């Protein structure tokens, strides 16, 4: 074998070994973001929902402060059920869906992790689209309002 080819092959193998230790990206979050963009008013971005109320974003505690925050509360619980009851990993679970006629269709057999997680995301995204966004509930003091 040509020494140059051997060197390239060795570099590829080392790269692949290193990649095996990289944790998976939360790919379904990309799907969830696309669903949210599809259902919310045009003047909003999905990022404006990332730190809203007590439950939209990482973690959550206390009582939801409004209907939109309740959407996130229900979504968090849906993911929790998917993990506990069905042994799914919602943050890395891939799934198939279609955005059509102002609704979202999830594909896959009922009861499979992909379908369960898609249904969680679908329900939350549609809820976002039907709930009022209150500017004063963005970036709230969670230590004060979410007990």
Curated annotation (Swiss-Prot):
Snake venom phospholipase A2 (PLA2) that inhibits neuromuscular transmission by blocking acetylcholine release from the nerve termini. PLA2 catalyzes the calcium-dependent hydrolysis of the 2-acyl groups in 3-sn-phosphoglycerides. It is found in: Secreted. One of its GO terms (molecular function) is toxin activity. It comes from Bungarus multicinctus. Belongs to the phospholipase A2 family. Group I subfamily. D49 sub-subfamily. Its cofactor is Ca(2+). Residues 20-27 form a propeptide. The keyword Repeat does not apply. Transmembrane segments: none annotated. It comes from the Eukaryota. Heterodimer; disulfide-linked. The A chains have phospholipase A2 activity and the B chains show homology with the basic protease inhibitors. The A1 chain is found in beta-1 and beta-2 bungarotoxins. The keyword Phosphoprotein does not apply. PROSITE patterns: PA2_ASP, PA2_HIS. Binds 1 Ca(2+) ion. Expressed by the venom gland. Its EC number is 3.1.1.4. It catalyses: a 1,2-diacyl-sn-glycero-3-phosphocholine + H2O = a 1-acyl-sn-glycero-3-phosphocholine + a fatty acid + H(+). This is Basic phospholipase A2 beta-bungarotoxin A1 chain. Its main location: secreted. CDD domains: PLA2c (cd00125). Keywords: Calcium, Disulfide bond, Hydrolase, Lipid degradation, Lipid metabolism, Metal-binding, Neurotoxin, Presynaptic neurotoxin, Secreted, Signal, Toxin. GO terms for biological process: arachidonate secretion; lipid catabolic process; phospholipid metabolic process. One of its GO terms (cellular component) is extracellular region.
């Amino acid at each position: 074998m040509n020494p140059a080819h051997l060197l390239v092959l060795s570099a590829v193998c080392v790269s692949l070994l290193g990649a095996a230790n990289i944790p998976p990206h939360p790919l379904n979050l990309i799907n969830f973001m696309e669903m949210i963009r599809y259902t919310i008013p045009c003047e909003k971005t999905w990022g404006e929902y990332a730190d809203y109320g007590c439950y939209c974003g990482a973690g959550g505690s206390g009582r939801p402060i409004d209907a939109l925050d309740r959407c996130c509360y229900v979504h968090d619980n849906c993911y929790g059920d998917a993990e506990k009851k069905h042994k799914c990993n919602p943050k890395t679970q891939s799934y198939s869906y279609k955005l059509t006629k102002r609704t979202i269709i999830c594909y896959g057999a009922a009861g499979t992790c992909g379908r369960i997680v898609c249904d969680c995301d679908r329900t939350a995204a549609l809820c976002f689209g039907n709930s009022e966004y209150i500017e004063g509930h963005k970036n709230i003091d969670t230590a004060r309002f979410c007990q």
